[in-house]
Structures are given as structure tokens and as C-alpha cells.
């Protein structure tokens, strides 16, 4: 039986949609007869200290915890609460990678395949170490492509840094065994713009394992947005257009991110901005909204959609 270790930054009980996708994919592998474990961080996006007190997460050793998702064992590397400061965030990534790599080296005999999910973008370093140092079969799932996203959103303005990061990322993509992307367009981009061999790229489309919400009993002019409030989402642009519209639509926002405070300042009679809200509560609010908003900066196409 092949022993596969999934490696992701986020995973349940952290209430992040990408983390749940990873957990659901891992669980399907397990149901199909593979020996699966997950290596991820402790909850940091929607941080809740109670998960350490209600036995959802149990301590194994210093800065290492364990939990489970359905029938899949999860190993959690301790991470502090997510910072929206860019410099602090990069330091958090480095700290997470350092502890992850130490774990992989120490437990190298417990897995045959490492299946890595690409956020943060510096996960390519782990992919290189897995393949070149540990000599493991390595699968790299790319949902968002960097440095293209950072460049288009002007998050990185140094051409030298962009060029060096792209070389590093391309090196990782070329030496690993398989690449998984979430759209046919991203596959074509990697082939045509990055020079990646077509036969090593597979496509797994994004999906939802949640039940469909019931349709609202009465149609109204209420729009709901739930999720990340960062630069890529560009919610501010939609709010400005909504405020300039003669139609009396109401927008309710639930989320967190680097742009939350700025978006909060844009509240008005028709714009209601709320912090992160538990999923069970969100589902109650969706019942009263006729429309759902999916927002993405117009400068992003294949590099970040549908990953964003």
C-alpha cells in the first residue's frame, strides 16, 4: 500500500475553504485504499484557542499536535495567528517551512509520496527538498501561480526578485514527478509560458462537498459576500460601483483579510461589513440573500482563477 503524506498550510478545524478541499481530497484517497496522513499548521486563519482545550487538537510533542478529519490522521505544526502584515507573513512562512522540513526529514521513512499544495508560494522550496534531498516521489498541486499574481497586483515591484522567484518555481515544477492544477487554462499556461511538459500535468477541478443552500423564498436585492478580503478580491471596486448605482441593492460582507479595515470604512446604509463569521452562521444568512458575489481583480485571469 502506497503511503501518501499530504502537505498543506491550512486544514480543518481551521475554517478555510482551501483547507477543507485538501482534507476532502485526502479523505477520498483514503477511501480508495491509500494510506494517508496530512501535515499542516495549527489553525491560524480563523484562530480559536478553544480547539486546544476541547480535544479537537491534542499535543504530541513540543510544537507538534495531532487531530483527525474523518478517517485521516493530521499532524499539526504549531503556527501563530495569521498576520496581514506582509513582512511578518513571510517570516511566518519561513518558520512553518523550517519546522515542516525538519518533520519530513525526521519522518522520511513513514511516507512514500509527498503531495504538496502550493499556498504559500514558497512551498516550492519544500517540493525541491522532497525530490532532491529525500528522493521522494513528489506531487505539487498549483492552485495559484506566483510570481505572476504578485507581479500583476504590484505586491512585488522588483524585477530581479520576480525573475529569481520564477526561476526557482520553474526548477521545482520541472524536477518533481507530477503537477496538479485546477483548470485547463492553467495547464496550457504552464506548457506555453513556463515550458513544463504536458504529460506531467493533471487537472483536478475545484468542487464543493457542502449541501446546496435552499433557495430564498422571496427574491430581494440583497447580495452576500463571504471569504477573504485581500488585494486579489478587489471588493472596493465593486462597492464603489454599487454606491454609484441607482438600484437600491444591499451588500452584506462577512470575512477577514489585509483589506478588512479599509473596506469597513466604506460601510453605508446599503453596505454592511462584518468580521469572520462561523460557517454555520453564514449558512443562515445565505438563506435571506438572492445573490452571491464572487470577486476577483480584473488583472488576474488564468494565474489566480478559479483558485481565488
PLM region descriptions:
Residues 1-62, 240-246:
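N-terminal subdomain of nucleotide-sugar transferases
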Residues 5, 208, 216-233, 239-246, ...:
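Conserved donor-binding/catalytic core segment of Leloir-type glycosyltransferases
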Residues 42, 185, 204-207:
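Carbohydrate-associated surface elements
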Residues 105, 122-125, 129-133, 159-179:
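Membrane-proximal helix-turn-helix segments that form the acceptor-binding/catalytic region
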Residues 137, 148-171, 210, 231:
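Nucleotide-sugar donor phosphate/pyrophosphate-binding loop at the beta->alpha transition
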Residues 166, 170-200:
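A short, active-site helix/loop in glycosyltransferases that binds the activated sugar's phosphate group
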Residues 233, 278-308:
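Nucleotide-sugar-dependent
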Residues 252, 260-283:
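Nucleotide-activated donor-binding/catalytic signature segment of Leloir-type glycosyltransferases, i.e.
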